[in-house]
Each structure stands twice: as C-alpha cells, then as structure tokens.
UniProtKB/Swiss-Prot annotation:
One of its GO terms (cellular component) is cytoplasm. Pathway: Amino-acid biosynthesis; L-arginine biosynthesis; N(2)-acetyl-L-ornithine from L-glutamate: step 2/4. Its main location: cytoplasm. PANTHER family: N-ACETYLGLUTAMATE SYNTHASE, N-ACETYLGLUTAMATE SYNTHASE, MITOCHONDRIAL. It comes from Thermus thermophilus (strain ATCC 27634 / DSM 579 / HB8). This is Acetylglutamate kinase. Catalyzes the ATP-dependent phosphorylation of N-acetyl-L-glutamate. The gene is argB.
Length: 249
C-alpha cells in the first residue's frame, strides 16, 4: 500500500482541476486539511467587513466568525464534491465535529486560536470505511469555535496521526536561487533551515511555509514537505524529483 499522507491544500478552486485529479488518483490513504482565504475574504468584503491580518493570522472578531465558518463550509463541500466525482469519496468536516480539534484562544486576535489537542478517532473511522476526510481548520475551546491557521492545523493533525505532512503551495520547494531550478534543496533538517534563514536564503513568504513543516515534525510527523500543488506533485515528491522534504535529522 502507498504511504498514508496528511495533505494541506489551499482553499482556492481556481485552477484546481489538475490538483483534484492528482489527489483523487493517489492510491494510499489521505487526510486533507484545507484553507479558505480567498472565499473568506470575498464573503467578508461582500458583507461590509474589512480583512485584517497580524503576523499572517486573520483577525477574527466574534461577529465575523460565522462568516469564516460559512466560507470554510462552502469551500470544503466544493472540494469534497470535486474529489468524489473523480472517484475518491470525500467527506467535508469541520475541526469542531466530534471535537476533532481543541484550541486555545489568542484573545488579541479575536476568535482566533492555536491547536492544543487532536482527536483522530472520527478520521480513522472514516478512513476505515473508505472515505477521505477533508477537514476545515476550526477548533473549539470552552467558549465556542476558533479560527485556526490551516497550516498550523494540518501540522497538528499530522502529528496526532503520526503521518507525513505535505504542504501544497504555489512554489516547488526551497531553492538557493529561485531562478535556477537546479538549486532546489531536496531535503533539509531543522538545523539546516536555521542556517539558511540566517543566510537570507529562506525569507519572505517561504518562511511561514517552512515553519509549518517544522512544526509538523515537532508535533510528531515522521517527515514533512513543501511542494507545488499541481499534477504529478505527490509522485515527484515521493520519488525525490520535486519539492523539499524536511526530516528531524
């Protein structure tokens, strides 16, 4: 059997046809965590709310949280439909379902939180029955739902499952020179990542992607990877032909 993978996908469905084909055809078990940034932003704007970010996290006042949940719900259902009609039965869930994700609030950001616990029982039950779980990054604390960064949620779920975490992005891994495909790093350790950050090789928008991969390792994932979300990505990644794989040592 092919390796079980936790895959974090973006929330945008624009241009996602090839990626959906790729995921639907993967022969091994998958758990997917999805974002929803574009859909959330569009709905907030439509309803007259302003989108604000602090440290890359969406500020989510209580009055906006229902909008965020609605947008994530719609995104998850569309992704699940896209996979199901390609032959991979997928079920869209929220992290609040069956207490999958337990969170701790970051009050300065409103109803935003970080994951402090993961219950994987429902995910494993669905996998055993032949379904692919598709999880929206909503956690629960004592006061209700929390908006959680999708990369953070994906790393936590991968760690709880003990599965590798694959973060699909718009770039093909880490490069010493982004303009030269021959300079891709096929594999990095946390120590090497810190050295590359000090050199300025890993900078800008790549930093949060790499940090998400390292967080997955700390949570218990055997390895993590950053790769471009396009047709053939999983085959290339698992064969060492694409992406950047992060291992504990």
């Amino acid at each position: 059997m092919s390796e079980a993978l936790l895959v974090k996908v973006g929330g945008s469905l624009r241009g996602a046809e090839a990626l959906l084909e790729e995921l639907a055809a993967y022969p091994g078990p998958l758990v997917l965590v999805h974002g929803g940034g574009p859909e959330i932003g569009e709905w907030l704007k439509r309803l007259g709310y302003e989108s604000r970010f602090v440290g890359g996290l969406r500020v989510t006042p209580p009055e906006q949280l229902e909008v965020v949940e609605m947008a994530l719900y719609l995104t998850g259902k569309r992704l699940a439909w896209g996979l199901s009609r390609r032959g991979r039965k997928a079920l869209a869930l929220s992290g609040r379902d069956a207490l999958c994700l337990r969170g701790r609030a970051l009050p300065e950001l409103g109803r935003v939180g970080e994951v402090v616990g993961v219950e994987v029982g429902l995910l494993l039950d669905l996998l055993e029955k032949g379904y692919t779980p598709l999880l929206a990054p909503i956690a629960l604390d004592e006061e209700g739902p929390l908006n959680v960064n999708a990369d953070t949620a994906a790393g936590a779920v991968a760690g709880a499952l003990g599965w590798p975490a694959v973060f699909l992005t718009d770039v093909e891994g880490v490069y010493r020179n982004p303009k030269d495909p021959k300079t891709r790093f096929p594999r990095l350790t946390p120590k090497e990542v810190e050295a590359l950050k000090e050199e300025g090789v890993i900078q800008g928008g790549m930093i949060p992607k790499v940090e998400a991969a390292l967080a997955a390792l700390r949570a218990g994932a055997p390895w993590a990877a950053v790769a471009k979300g396009e047709r053939g990505v999983l085959r290339r990644l698992l064969s060492g032909e694409g992406g950047t794989l992060f291992s504990p040592s």
